[in-house]
């Protein structure tokens, strides 16, 4: 096999792996429903480019119809290349809106020089994006956070916030008006890096604002990358833990009624038997040799029909 052919096979496997990971996430959390208009938040980074690209490919083959509109927030950062995103989006034929809001000046005015601006900037950006989604009539807001982001947030909250809390793949905004989805929740960052190189997305640097990097998040990110190199499977196991929570074996009295425990009571996850070692779920083994057949999912609720986004569009007569 030639080097070129081998690389083509690897690229094809990567594309299929990402498509299945995003499709599984959408299916598991019922992220996309018939008739949805999804606002894809596009920053110009590798993650949001990949998100839009994969959603477009799923849109073309999915058994349901939904719309995509890309939205970028131009925060008037010095040196921001205003022409890059419109040129790219027009070249691929995706409807888009560029929202111009000078949050850069606001943040610089409020915070001291050299301080990390990410937190305040994020809050301002969120409010503007929510408003834009309402103006456009969008039913869902899609963000480009991936599996590594979710785990990093969990450790940040544990180490610095004293909370066992991560970043949900799907949430309702505090005012109840918006559904936010993260279709890349099952996707590895290293796969997104490879995909961005493969697709040659016109990446816009994320440090144009001149803000100091979030040191805490940087330390957590380095820790996760180090673990991934030294202990294969650890990242997958940790993410699996977020999907297999056992409240009766934690210490939150609001999640579980410890005070009401009585003899003879049978717990869903067992009492002392829950300490026995468990096997890691097979779906979190290395995905490089992933089965290309469509992944079946069990309905979460009997009354709700789950649509498999990975299924093909139904054929029409004469097709």
UniProtKB/Swiss-Prot annotation:
EC code: 2.8.1.-
Predominant location: cytoplasm
UniProt GO molecular function: 4 iron, 4 sulfur cluster binding; ATP binding; magnesium ion binding; sulfurtransferase activity; tRNA binding
GO biological process: tRNA thio-modification
Keywords from the UniProt entry: 4Fe-4S, ATP-binding, Cytoplasm, Iron, Iron-sulfur, Magnesium, Metal-binding, Nucleotide-binding, RNA-binding, Transferase, tRNA processing, tRNA-binding
Broad EC category: transferase
Cofactor binding remark: Binds 1 [4Fe-4S] cluster per subunit. The cluster is chelated by three Cys residues, the fourth Fe has a free coordination site that may bind a sulfur atom transferred from the persulfide of IscS.
UniProt short sequence motif PP-loop motif, positions renumbered to this chain: 43-48
Localization per Swiss-Prot or TrEMBL: Cytoplasm
GO CC annotation: cytoplasm
UniProt-listed InterPro entries: Rossmann-like_a/b/a_fold, TilS/TtcA_N, tRNA_Cyd_32_2_STrfase, tRNA_thiolation_TtcA_Ctu1
Positions bound to [4Fe-4S] cluster: 118, 121, 209
Required co-factors: Mg(2+); [4Fe-4S] cluster
Pfam families linked to this entry: ATP_bind_3
Family note: Belongs to the TtcA family.
Physiological role: Catalyzes the ATP-dependent 2-thiolation of cytidine in position 32 of tRNA, to form 2-thiocytidine (s(2)C32). The sulfur atoms are provided by the cysteine/cysteine desulfurase (IscS) system.
PANTHER family linked to this entry: AMINOTRAN_5 DOMAIN-CONTAINING PROTEIN, SULFURTRANSFERASE-RELATED
Name of protein: tRNA-cytidine(32) 2-sulfurtransferase
Organism: Neisseria gonorrhoeae (strain NCCP11945)
């Amino acid at each position: 096999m030639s080097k070129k052919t081998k690389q083509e096979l690897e690229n094809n496997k990567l594309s299929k792996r990402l498509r299945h990971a995003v499709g599984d996430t959408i299916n598991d959390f019922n992220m996309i429903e018939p008739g949805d208009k999804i606002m894809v938040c596009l920053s110009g980074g590798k993650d949001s480019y990949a998100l839009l690209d994969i959603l477009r490919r799923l849109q073309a083959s999915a058994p349901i119809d939904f719309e995509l509109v890309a939205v970028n927030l131009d925060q008037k950062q010095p040196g921001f290349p205003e022409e890059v995103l419109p040129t790219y989006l027009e070249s691929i034929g995706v409807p888009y809106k560029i929202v111009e809001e000078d949050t850069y000046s606001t943040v610089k005015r409020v915070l001291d020089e050299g301080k990390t601006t990410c937190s305040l900037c994020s809050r301002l950006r969120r409010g503007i994006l929510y408003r834009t989604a309402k103006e456009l009539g969008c039913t869902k807001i899609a963000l480009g956070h991936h599996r590594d982001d979710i785990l990093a947030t969990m450790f940040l909250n544990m180490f610095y916030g004293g909370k066992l809390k991560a970043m949900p793949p799907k949430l309702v905004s505090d005012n109840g008006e918006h559904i936010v989805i993260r279709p890349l929740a099952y996707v590895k960052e290293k796969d997104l890096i490879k995909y961005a190189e493969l697709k040659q997305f016109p990446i816009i640097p994320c440090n144009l604002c001149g803000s100091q990097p979030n040191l805490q998040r940087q330390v957590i990110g380095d820790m996760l990358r180090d673990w991934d190199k030294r202990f294969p499977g650890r990242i997958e196991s940790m993410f699996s833990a977020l999907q297999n929570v056992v409240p009766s074996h934690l210490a939150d009295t609001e999640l579980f009624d410890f005070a009401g425990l009585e003899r003879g009571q049978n717990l869903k996850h067992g009492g002392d038997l829950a300490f026995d070692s468990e096997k890691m779920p097979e779906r979190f083994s290395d995905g490089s040799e992933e089965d290309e057949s469509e992944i079946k999912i069990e309905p979460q609720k009997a009354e709700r029909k789950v649509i498999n986004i990975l299924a093909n569009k139904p054929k029409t007569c004469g097709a």
